[in-house]
Amino acid sequence: AFVGNPAENNRVVYLGGFGGYIIAGFDHNIVNKAGEDFEVILMKSSAPEPAVVYVMPDLNGDAKPNETWYELKGSQFSNSKRNYWVRYYRATSTADNITWLDSEGSRGELKSGYLTASTASWWWSETKTDSITFYGTRLPDSYENTGTASAQFWTVPTGKFAWGYAENNSGTDYDADNGSKKLDISNAVDVNGN
């Protein structure tokens, strides 16, 4: 995810696995008009990594993200898991990876795809405890292996994430000219999907 306007700023933020997020505030209201209301610019050269987008009205006017968040429903809404969580555990040494447990009892570890020895340095600097938990919606797996056991070929099937997700460089709401996803506030739903 870019921070700011990518035409003016080349800084990139890697959001990582489940729970990575950026909160963006605005000095004006975004009006919910017919059709798309705002866009999220993504890295044009990146692989599709569909991400859920949440919005929050500032009803109390304090300009802080302290009210109810609403998920923007996308094309995989009915295939997603609500009230999902992942708990990450601090690596016990600089040579180890961060491990995780999810709300379904699955376990694993964060592994770097950037040729670093471990993911221990990825730990959240503001987190002083040995674990941190993120809650949200889990999308279906993006990639599918269309190859064989000896010759794997992982790809995101065309049309799987047709609309409604950030960091997804395909679909009906993707604007290839500026590399953005055009999103509609009318798709906002509460934690119960209403």
Spans of model-derived segments:
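A domain-level signal for the mature, folded cores of soluble proteins
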Residues: 1-51, 59, 68-194
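Short loop/turn segments immediately following beta-strands, especially the blade-tip
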Residues: 56-62
